[in-house]
Amino acid sequence: MALPRSQARGWVKAAKMAQRRRPADDTGGPQSPAPGSQRAALYVHWPYCEKRCSYCNFNKYIPRGVDEAALRRCLVIEAQTLLRLSGVRRVESVFFGGGTPSLASPHTVAAVLEAVAQAAHLPADSEVTLEANPTSASGSRLAAFGAAGVNRLSIGLQSLDDTELQLLGRTHSARDALQTLAEAQRLFPGRVSVDLMLGLPAQQVGPWLRQLQGLLRCCDDHVSLYQLSLERGTTLFTQVQQGALPAPDPELAAEMYQEGRAVLREAGFRQYEVSNFARNGALSTHNWTYWQCGQYLGVGPGAHGRFIPQGAGGHTREARIQTLEPDSWMKEVMLFGHGTRRRVPLSELELLEEVLAMGLRTDVGITHQHWQQFEPQLTLWDLFGASKEVKELQEQGLLLLDHRGLRCSWEGLAVLDSLLLSLLSRLQEAWQQRTPSSVPRG
């Protein structure tokens, strides 16, 4: 149900009143919408950065005379168009990512949120996250984003070591990072997430753990740990290939991850996903939608989405990718109302593979009820109950299959990639042997 314009403008005020509310249950995750429901999350991509970090191969550009008013107008148009095409009536969360969305004007954020609230129901307590870098996130700017409707921040600290920050090509220092973190916590208490990278060239376990322990003395209730991935085409990849830097040691990275998980658990953090840790119920409801294979709309250059185009008469979930280059994307939005470059219908098996691979990233795993929303006939017991490989994984203490569903143990989360090889193979085998059904796809 669309909101009248006056109600849309009042959304920010209502959101600020509701943002202190937090679910008391810290053992599960946010409720997952049915796969073909009229609910979705919304991702908004801001494509610009001050500079390209040495490790990054994301779709981002260094701004040269950006017409933000034109970009803002196109973000608004595309959000409204995709909401109409998808038939989505309720937006559960909004995430402004990039790029560096903290470089955007708060007016752009407000305009997108107002457009969403006009086209669909955006609850006052919806999670609205903005990614921020310390050098573009002064206290006054953060306050302005809060006034625009943002109620959660994700700060890309990456490291608290100045030498490592220089290696990564970051524009901030460790001191900048800590100052931004303190200001963010003052403005968004209990709703600030921080990223910390591990597995850098020449990085050692002890110094990295001391960084993490230092961060825990001043951080909020959400921490993400990301292992460096050397991506072809990045400066860091070239430096390692040419021998200017040592290749990251995967065994050391695995040790950092294991030790880091233990430190976070000791500090009261729940590892609710492979890379994400929260305490006091501070899970990211937006990212939870991804892991539970809920629908999400991707707005902006290069954004990805997964939804059923019900508003256009569709019945099959599609993977959608928007045009990468900002100028080309804006031209398409002005011509067609959206800049979708590629639409790939997902088969029933492809969707189930995503449900399995994404769901097992979480500590909750895949409940029987959740699986049946996507596949009512072939149960988790049918798939894995008699599997020799699954029994072996259970005996090793890595996997659990019981009355709740299928999930990794705490030890299993650390080696999920190796577990998925057996599980996906078993799913594919069982799918080929099944009796075809007429169950509609979600």
Curated annotation (Swiss-Prot):
Indicate yes or no for the key word Mitochondrion: yes
Single biological process term from Gene Ontology: porphyrin-containing compound biosynthetic process
Kindly state which keywords UniProt assigns to this record, in alphabetical order.
Answer: 4Fe-4S, Chaperone, Heme, Iron, Iron-sulfur, Metal-binding, Mitochondrion, S-adenosyl-L-methionine, Transit peptide
Chain positions recorded as S-adenosyl-L-methionine 2 binding sites: G99, T100, Q158, R170, D195
Entry-linked PROSITE patterns? RADICAL_SAM
Q: Which residues form the Radical SAM core domain?
A: 34-270
Matching entries from InterPro entries are given as: Aldolase_TIM, Coproporphyrinogen-III_oxidase, Elp3/MiaA/NifB-like_rSAM, HemN_C, HemW-like, rSAM
Q: Which GO terms describe its cellular component?
A: cytoplasm; mitochondrion
> Where does the transit peptide lie?
1-22
Question: Where do the record's region annotations for Disordered lie?
Answer: 1-37
NCBIfam families in alphabetical order: hemN_rel
Which family does the UniProt entry place this protein in?
A: Belongs to the anaerobic coproporphyrinogen-III oxidase family. HemW subfamily.
Q: What is this protein called?
A: Radical S-adenosyl methionine domain-containing protein 1, mitochondrial
Organism classification, top ranks? Answer: Eukaryota, Metazoa, Chordata, Craniata, Vertebrata
